């Protein structure tokens, strides 16, 4: 993987990730949003439909794909690309976040994490080395190191110990990744909770090890938005400029805009797909809750400015009807729209950076939403 930085507008960055795959060269234009395909599928969508929304890269979930279908079945197909028939780039998380979300079902040690399989109850063990092996079998184009996602709230001492262990796990992840002869990309994950000095130590340690990109982890885990913004404003300028920056598990449309304002290049989140299945649809001027009775006889399209299959062909009344009847097509049409909304948003962001009018775009974006622009505490780097 290569990262090419074309242009900046303030702290916002316009570039691309370039991947050499057996099927050819693939570019992922950045800033980019990655739809989440937890179990090897973006829920309800074929790969062709996901691609039609504008997606150029997907996220797969190492933890869930390890438990089902498992490494052996994955190897029999070739890798995850062959299994799910998505032959463009795939990023896989390390499994760390899912393991740590198990709470009392898991026990963390220096070696790794012992936990109870949520599917069948058996006790299993995941380590940095095992995570690298699973992701190697998945054929991930971007592999994430195994780390501990520091919870919120956490004391300074806990966040420090957690971050230091994640750094030791980062070294082990790097070593096993290299032993496997993996030629794809490996990203480090910056931890440290809401404490700036810990984030700095984490980043410096990761840079010393050396990675192809750097993710900001341990945010969007319940902390106030102000803390997320503060940490991003503090740490992003310190990440090597020639490496991509990935904000994990984020988020709402405004979170993407705020991340880009602070120098982030990559995002992922289940929000557009999960919200779609619950009738919560993103449109140019905010949100449409399609289950609201006022849409029962609304013959207008969901979003007149959207060019997705759903908006070009169906009315709000039809989407309301499908939802009320519990029809699968309703969830699918909603998902197509929400994914397209996110990709259109990213395309608009990229164009605004290219045109050096990103600040104006931010003002217009919030004006359409009827919201004030959140303050940016750091002086823009021009």
From Swiss-Prot:
Binds 1 zinc ion per subunit. Residues 249-255, 273-277 are annotated as: RNA binding. One of its GO terms (cellular component) is cytosol. Pathway: tRNA modification; tRNA-queuosine biosynthesis. Keywords: Glycosyltransferase, Metal-binding, Queuosine biosynthesis, Transferase, tRNA processing, Zinc. GO terms for molecular function: metal ion binding; tRNA-guanosine(34) queuine transglycosylase activity. Its EC number is 2.4.2.29. The active site is at residues 93, 268. Its cofactor is Zn(2+). Substrate binds at residues 93-97, 147, 191, 218. It comes from the Bacteria. GO terms for biological process: queuosine biosynthetic process; tRNA wobble guanine modification; tRNA-guanine transglycosylation. The keyword Transit peptide does not apply. The keyword NAD does not apply. Zn(2+) binds at residues 306, 308, 311, 337. It catalyses: 7-aminomethyl-7-carbaguanine + guanosine(34) in tRNA = 7-aminomethyl-7-carbaguanosine(34) in tRNA + guanine. Homodimer. Within each dimer, one monomer is responsible for RNA recognition and catalysis, while the other monomer binds to the replacement base PreQ1. Catalyzes the base-exchange of a guanine (G) residue with the queuine precursor 7-aminomethyl-7-deazaguanine (PreQ1) at position 34 (anticodon wobble position) in tRNAs with GU(N) anticodons (tRNA-Asp, -Asn, -His and -Tyr). Catalysis occurs through a double-displacement mechanism. The nucleophile active site attacks the C1' of nucleotide 34 to detach the guanine base from the RNA, forming a covalent enzyme-RNA intermediate. The proton acceptor active site deprotonates the incoming PreQ1, allowing a nucleophilic attack on the C1' of the ribose to form the product. NCBIfam families: Q_tRNA_tgt (TIGR00430), tgt_general (TIGR00449). Belongs to the queuine tRNA-ribosyltransferase family. This is Queuine tRNA-ribosyltransferase. The lineage of its organism: Bacteria, Pseudomonadati, Pseudomonadota, Gammaproteobacteria, Pasteurellales. The gene is tgt.
